[in-house]
Design a protein with these regions (language model features):
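Flexible "arm" and connector segments at domain edges
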Residues: 1-65, 69-107
Length: 107
């Protein structure tokens, strides 16, 4: 079972950094650059995750997924979306087939 506490602690740190000076931390500098820069970083980390998966190196994949999750958390925080919001959506989808879930989405 995943320890969500560490993710909540990371999220709390990210929220704190939203108001920080851009030169005070990497995350504060990302927030200052705005949505496009954050999205670009998420896309970069997603591509690196895919490449690590194709390489078949488990440790490299774990590290890239961690980077992807981290930058996804930055993006979520940027839009005031918390870990609990995502967990609620997972709970909502639990037990629903992917096909049925997609059909339930607005067009």
């Amino acid at each position: 079972m995943i320890d969500l506490e560490v993710i909540h602690r990371v999220q709390a740190t990210l929220v704190e950094r939203k108001g920080a000076a851009p030169d005070s931390s990497y995350v504060a500098s990302l927030y200052a650059k705005g949505t496009d820069a954050i999205c670009k970083k998420v896309a970069e980390e997603a591509a690196e995750t895919i490449m690590a998966a194709k390489d078949g190196d488990r440790l490299h994949l774990v590290r890239e997924v961690c980077d992807l999750w981290f930058h996804s958390l930055v993006l979520m925080s940027h839009f005031d979306i918390g870990v609990d919001d995502i967990m609620c959506e997972f709970r909502r989808r639990e037990g629903i087939s992917g096909i049925d879930e997609k059909k339930s989405r607005p067009a």
